[in-house]
Amino acid sequence: KCSPSGAICSGFGPPEQCCSGACVPHPILRIFVCQ
């Protein structure tokens, strides 16, 4: 099961956790989100 775009993800986790395969830093909030 993968996370959709915009879902919070771990910046240190495997990129496969996101459906897009990319976990990127949020521009405002200090979190990582799926691209």
UniProtKB/Swiss-Prot annotation:
One Pfam assignment: Tryp_inh
One MF annotation (Gene Ontology) recorded for this entry: serine-type endopeptidase inhibitor activity
The keyword Disulfide bond appears for this protein: yes
Site feature (Reactive bond for trypsin) residues: R30, I31
Disulfide cysteine pairs (residue numbers): C2-C19, C9-C23, C18-C34
Keyword annotations from UniProtKB, A to Z: Disulfide bond, Knottin, Protease inhibitor, Serine protease inhibitor
Domain statement: The presence of a 'disulfide through disulfide knot' structurally defines this protein as a knottin.
Entry similarity comment: Belongs to the Mirabilis serine proteinase inhibitor family.
Function field: Trypsin inhibitor.
Protein name, per record: Trypsin inhibitor 1
